Amino acid sequence: MTLPSGHPKSRLMKRFASLGPYLREGQCENDRFFFDCLAVCVNVKPAPELREFWGWWIELHAEDTRFTYSYQFGLFDKKGQWTPEKIKDTEVKTKLETTLRDFHRRLGELLATMELTLEPAADFKEKLIKLSA
């Protein structure tokens, strides 16, 4: 499948996977790509498969010459589902923002090598954190 940008989806998937463990291939469809990060474990006592994490997820949508994104912070629960949550703990919030900022920078650099840009989606309502240094 070739996306509107003219790049084959298989090549984009391979390049996105090179960014690290963020890409969730099973949740990518057509011109939509899903990434997430389980940044902070809520409680290390439960068995690994029962742990919950604070983190973020970002969805990209391919367009002609750019990708648009929207992201959210929240809780990845025991069932493997994301729930948007306001992060109250300053240390956790800082960690989430730092990991998202780092991912965003590397994603933008990767897209630039393909002459594509990365911009917030028009319907993205969240207050943007400063993503570029």
UniProtKB/Swiss-Prot annotation:
Keyword Transferase assigned: no
Organism superkingdom: Bacteria
Gene3D superfamilies the UniProt entry points to: Sigma factor-binding protein Crl monomer
GO biological process, one term: positive regulation of DNA-templated transcription
Localization annotation: Cytoplasm
Region described as Essential for activity: 99-122
UniProt main location, coarse: cytoplasm
Keywords for this protein: Activator, Cytoplasm, Transcription, Transcription regulation
Entries under Pfam families matching the protein: Crl
Keyword Transcription regulation assigned: yes
Its biological purpose: Binds to the sigma-S subunit of RNA polymerase, activating expression of sigma-S-regulated genes. Stimulates RNA polymerase holoenzyme formation and may bind to several other sigma factors, such as sigma-70 and sigma-32.
Protein name: Sigma factor-binding protein Crl
Organism (species): Serratia proteamaculans (strain 568)
